[in-house]
Amino acid sequence: MMRVGTEEQYRTTNLVSVGTGRTISVATSTALPAAYVTATDAAIARYNAQNLLIRFVRVTSGAEITLAQAPKSARYLASGGFPTGGNPYNQVLINSGAIGTANPSTYIATILAHEIGHCIGFRHTDYMDRSFSCGGAVSNEGASTVGAILIPGTPSAADPNSWMLACIGSGNDRPFNPNDVIALGVVY
């Protein structure tokens, strides 16, 4: 059974500068299986469908965010960082061996949208207790040096389907739910 956090959508102190609009370029490394190009396009489409001031486009080189193969020894599905200097974090490491290639436009797209979310400043909705989505012992990521700011207008009630929960079950699809849409709209 999955439990969820008691407060939901969070962002970092630093965000991507968008002004009146900004398009972020994303590249999928050729070291990743072809299914990841499909998944990248699906993740980008999820964001662009929200009509935000931040938009995304897939490119083959010169990207602001590169989706790259994680080391074979990686013990995570994927890992991104947080924005600095008004720019997105520049890399997401993806453990394609652990994720596989099935369900690129749902499961894999959810993972990529989640990591892109980190790159533009979204925290785990259950950062205060990862056991809500991951199980196991209580694990608080804390505000760290990047901040954990509750996004206005998002609920303090449980929301088990956010795209920014820390963990995801194999094969699950988490498109943006209504609370995610509010968070995206408030921030971007």
Task: For the regions a language model picked out, list residue spans one by one.
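Disordered inhibitory propeptide/activation segment of secreted metzincin zinc metalloprotease zymogens
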Residues: 1-35, 144-156
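Short pre-active-site segment immediately N-terminal to the catalytic Zn-binding motif
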Residues: 94-113
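A short alpha-helix/helix-coil micro-patch that ends at or immediately precedes a cysteine
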Residues: 26, 31-58
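Surface-exposed patches in mature extracellular/periplasmic domains of secreted proteins
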Residues: 49-63, 124-131
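Catalytic zinc-binding patch centered on the HExxH motif and its immediate surroundings
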Residues: 36, 66-91
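Sec-exported extracytoplasmic/periplasmic mature domains
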Residues: 45-53, 117-125, 169, 185-188
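Acidic helix-start/capping segments at beta-turn-to-alpha-helix junctions
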Residues: 25-30, 57-75, 134-136
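The catalytic-center signature of Zn2+-dependent metalloproteases
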Residues: 106, 113-174
